[in-house]
């Protein structure tokens, strides 16, 4: 269900609809097409228990009141109940419609034509304060329709949060801003604590998995630039497994990430959000995820969060505090 002009309307996955702001978007990001593969039963270790706790309902109420989107909802994150029940959430800036169409992602796609909520930076900051967060992750849709890709909006939000309480740790999980250094500088020049950008998959699968405007080395060079300009800012990336990659390719991706100074890496199982998206090629066992973590730490990452249900921002506060990462 989508809420349009205050009315809940059923929009089928893959269908086109008109947003409240007057531009068109595609529900779940991928147009209707034949199923990619026969449905594969999920193993028992991927089953999630629902937890509608008081904290979960509190976070949901605050984000709705302040007209904020969360990647937890828009990307159908399997950890939404756990994270929200612990009073944490990942706020998605600049709306819920992305200008790109990655084949694994269920976020709606379209062209927002420059629309931005100018009140969002302060609304986000006030929400963080009301939730009582010590650590917040800010992420966003890609906004190629904006001159700076939305970097200035990100910076304004980080600054608003830090102005309310400079002790709140802020992680910015950003788009690539087309790899333009002047845009990246807008984020670096705030008091941000962690800058993350997801490489998503191994180099061989980048084109079939990600939007053509994204790039394997574009992501790595983005994070390399961040580390060179601001060595004290932690850098982070994330890989999904189960898209057809090999373990050897995963380890090579780890090597490439370490070669540009990335500090933290997360690995989790890809799960097909709708029948129109890429199918799951394999389910990786919890034991193999433990092996990924062991290898990653041996390669020099300060922290490796690896598990079937791990996502890039999963309990990011906890990951940040491990191994003396707290700033």
Swiss-Prot record:
This is Lipoyl synthase. [4Fe-4S] cluster 2 binds at residues 98, 102, 105. Keywords: 4Fe-4S, Cytoplasm, Iron, Iron-sulfur, Metal-binding, S-adenosyl-L-methionine, Transferase. Binds 2 [4Fe-4S] clusters per subunit. One cluster is coordinated with 3 cysteines and an exchangeable S-adenosyl-L-methionine. Signal peptide: none annotated. Its main location: cytoplasm. [4Fe-4S] cluster 1 binds at residues 72, 77, 83, 313. GO terms for molecular function: 4 iron, 4 sulfur cluster binding; lipoate synthase activity; metal ion binding. It is found in: Cytoplasm. Its EC number is 2.8.1.8. Pathway: Protein modification; protein lipoylation via endogenous pathway; protein N(6)-(lipoyl)lysine from octanoyl-[acyl-carrier-protein]: step 2/2. It comes from Francisella tularensis subsp. mediasiatica (strain FSC147). It catalyses: [[Fe-S] cluster scaffold protein carrying a second [4Fe-4S](2+) cluster] + N(6)-octanoyl-L-lysyl-[protein] + 2 oxidized [2Fe-2S]-[ferredoxin] + 2 S-adenosyl-L-methionine + 4 H(+) = [[Fe-S] cluster scaffold protein] + N(6)-[(R)-dihydrolipoyl]-L-lysyl-[protein] + 4 Fe(3+) + 2 hydrogen sulfide + 2 5'-deoxyadenosine + 2 L-methionine + 2 reduced [2Fe-2S]-[ferredoxin]. Its cofactor is [4Fe-4S] cluster. Belongs to the radical SAM superfamily. Lipoyl synthase family. It comes from the Bacteria. PANTHER family: LIPOYL SYNTHASE, LIPOYL SYNTHASE, MITOCHONDRIAL. One of its GO terms (cellular component) is cytoplasm. Residues 83-302 form the Radical SAM core domain. SMART domains: Elp3. Transmembrane segments: none annotated. Gene3D superfamilies: Aldolase class I (3.20.20.70).
């Amino acid at each position: 269900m989508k809420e349009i002009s205050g009315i809940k309307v059923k929009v089928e996955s893959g269908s086109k609809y008109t947003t409240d702001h007057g531009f068109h978007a595609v529900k779940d990001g991928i147009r209707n097409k034949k199923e990619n593969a026969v449905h594969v039963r999920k193993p028992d270790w991927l089953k999630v228990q629902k937890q509608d706790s008081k904290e979960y309902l509190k976070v949901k109420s605050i984000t709705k009141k302040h007209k904020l989107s969360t990647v937890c909802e828009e990307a159908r994150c399997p950890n939404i109940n756990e994270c929200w029940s612990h009073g944490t959430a990942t706020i998605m800036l600049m709306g819920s419609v992305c200008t790109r169409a990655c084949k694994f992602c269920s976020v709606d796609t379209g062209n927002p034509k420059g629309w931005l909520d100018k009140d969002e930076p302060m609304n986000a900051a006030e929400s963080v304060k009301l939730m009582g967060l010590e650590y917040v992750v800010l992420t966003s849709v890609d906004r190629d329709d904006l001159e700076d890709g939305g970097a200035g909006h990100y910076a304004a939000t980080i600054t608003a949060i830090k102005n309310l309480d400079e002790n709140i740790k802020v992680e910015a999980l950003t788009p690539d801003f087309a790899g333009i250094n002047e845009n990246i500088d807008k984020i670096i020049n705030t008091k941000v604590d962690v800058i993350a950008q997801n490489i998503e998959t191994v180099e061989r699968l980048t084109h079939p998995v990600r939007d053509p405007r994204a790039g394997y080395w574009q992501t790595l060079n983005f994070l390399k630039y961040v580390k060179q300009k601001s060595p004290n800012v932690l850098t982070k990336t994330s890989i999904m497994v189960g898209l057809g990659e090999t373990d050897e390719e995963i380890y090579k991706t780890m090597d490439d990430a370490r070669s540009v100074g990335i500090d933290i890496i997360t690995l989790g199982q890809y799960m097909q959000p709708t029948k129109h998206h890429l199918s799951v090629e394999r389910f990786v066992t919890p034991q193999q995820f433990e092996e990924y973590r062991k290898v990653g730490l041996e390669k020099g990452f300060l922290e490796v969060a690896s598990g079937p249900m791990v996502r890039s921002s999963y309990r990011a506060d906890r990951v940040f505090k491990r191994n003396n990462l707290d700033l």
